[in-house]
Amino acid sequence: SPLARIQAENAISRIDYPSEIITMLEVADEDLTRPVHEMGGKGMFCTKLEKALLKNQIDCAIHSAKDCATIETEGTELLGVVYRGDPRDCVIGKHSLNQLPAGSRIGTSAPRRIEALKLIRPDCHVVEVRGNVNTRLNKINSGEVDALILGQSVIDRMGLDVPHHTISEEVILPAAGAGKVVVQV
């Protein structure tokens, strides 16, 4: 995805070691019809890269820390955070979370965000959306959803010029590892 490439390029620039980016479509990105938790959860954005590490097809993998499984894959190791961004979530759209009209359709796929939205805005409808950032943004442009919830670091890293409103950590707690990019060997 464009975001994964941006994160890899940014990580490489900080590591300052001659590198080649090898892209792979992860398991969770291949099936956009099922929720990630039905496929096995967080680690589904890292499985192919981890297999490539174990087969010595790549030297390291760059991940969004929030997508990594909580238990390391045997034979691999997370070396640490290469860089970090704003961990908070944000609402993409004309209105902040509090200002969204009743009945608004809010797109997200994270169970954490879905449950928070049910508590905070029970008068709105949560629409599960999957896909890369541009695919999700197109759902606003097409009218499929009125707003999206994305990580603020996504907006910052991609340099997106879209109306957005950052959500306080007191309103929706960020995901563990949100905004952090890690290297795995």
Place the predicted regions along the sequence by residue.
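Domain-level signature for soluble enzymes in the chorismate/prephenate branch of the shikimate pathway
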Residues: 2-185
